[in-house]
Amino acid sequence: MGSATVLDSIIEGVRADVAAREAAVSMDEVKEQAKRAPAPLDVMAALRASGIAVIAEVKRASPSRGALASIADPAELARAYEDGGARIISVLTEQRRFNGSLDDLDAVRAAVSIPVLRKDFIVRPYQIHEARAHGADMLLLIVAALEQPVLESLLERTESLGMTALVEVHTEEEADRALQAGASVIGVNARDLKTLEVDRDCFARIAPGLPSNVIRVAESGVRGTADLLAYAGAGADAVLVGEGLVTSGDPRSAVADLVTAGAHPSCPKPAR
């Protein structure tokens, strides 16, 4: 084994935090909370609607940049995103590197009527029931963080609760694993979570090899409409944008600009 990667150290912290939460709220309790939660919203309908879907992210910090934005009211930010035309709101709940929390997820879920994505490093079944209990309609599964049998069982559990998994990949080999697991939504992250380096050409390399029935999401590296159009040209159905929105000064307008570009007749349409 080589030296520990950034991803390894994040997951080590996540495992400790999950164990602490499970000690406070048992798996049985969190399963009961999940059963009582309102039914999940239709994520696939949001992603398949015409135009490029914008998934707008509530993101306070990142391992690569540190603190990004002081978000006093995540609910207000989420409403601004929804008003701007975002189809889905992504909420970071990892606390050590991204300064997120389940409180942020609760606040956003209560504030908007569109689907909400729990963005975290999901490594245990507990976190899936926890996501549902806190109102998530969608959650992130990162192929690089999971052995294949674990990926497959977590994906199956996510779907059994009526949620949709955004299965994240960074290489062609990971994309093959995502497909083998049965992913219906695949996100290509331009950022390598092991090194934090960004490779904007990553999506254009991987997306053409994905079957036409798979929804393709471009993650990381969207700084404005030019990046959205480039990703659309490479086959994106959706873009996930965080840093570019929380640092924009006017998140509603920043989302609206992306949505308008993604709906424009000149915007490339994915081949289906």
Curated annotation (Swiss-Prot):
InterPro entries: Aldolase_TIM, Indole-3-glycerol_P_synth, Indole-3-glycerol_P_synth_dom, Indole-3-GlycerolPSynthase_CS, RibuloseP-bd_barrel. It is an enzyme of class 4 (lyase). Coiled coil: none annotated. It holds the Pfam family IGPS. Its EC number is 4.1.1.48. Pathway: Amino-acid biosynthesis; L-tryptophan biosynthesis; L-tryptophan from chorismate: step 4/5. GO terms for molecular function: indole-3-glycerol-phosphate synthase activity; phosphoribosylanthranilate isomerase activity. GO terms for biological process: L-tryptophan biosynthetic process. Keywords: Amino-acid biosynthesis, Aromatic amino acid biosynthesis, Decarboxylase, Lyase, Tryptophan biosynthesis. Signal peptide: none annotated. It catalyses: 1-(2-carboxyphenylamino)-1-deoxy-D-ribulose 5-phosphate + H(+) = (1S,2R)-1-C-(indol-3-yl)glycerol 3-phosphate + CO2 + H2O. HAMAP family: IGPS_A (MF_00134_A), IGPS_B (MF_00134_B). Belongs to the TrpC family. This is Indole-3-glycerol phosphate synthase. The lineage of its organism: Bacteria, Bacillati, Actinomycetota, Actinomycetes, Mycobacteriales.
